[in-house]
Amino acid sequence: MTKIFRLKSIAILFALILFQSTDAKAQCKFHVDLDYHYYFGLAGKVGSKTDTRSDYNMGGNSLTLAARYDVHPKVSVGAGVGLARYTQRYFNTLPIYATLRYKPIEKVKDAYVFTDLGYAIDSEKDDFTPGVLFNLGVGYTKMSAKHFGVNFQLGYNLKQFKYNHSNIPDLKSTRHSVIFGVGLTF
């Protein structure tokens, strides 16, 4: 399967998920999230060398779009796509991920724990670096209208990169970061 065909298939699937969510908004089970995350880099590892924040001012930014469905009043599952830029050993990523939210506290119904698991696709033409993505954290959504709210997140981000550098093929790098996120929920 070619990369272009794979990208088109993913884009069509994501568009269908978003299209379905606009038809079912009256049921309030479908949600669309547009989030910005800042990645406060803690440590990075390339081969056997580990760098910390005191060695480099590691950071990153991402913009993600996810469609979620409430399978239970406390559980929401979905899929998302995003664009991310990691600084210090600069990497651009195009992650596609699955997301899960769970609301464990009955008295604070807007608070949740979340996890995202996905993979950043490879595209040398567009300068995207492939690799595994894992997020884990807590969040809070404050709805100001039936279909509009503000979302806040704090969590942990693990990103593994696979890239070529000079004469070294398939070099692997790992980045650990704290997530600070804010976004809109529709």
Whereabouts are the PLM-identified features?
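Sequence/structural signature of outer-membrane beta-barrel proteins
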Residues: 39-49, 82-89, 118-125, 158-166
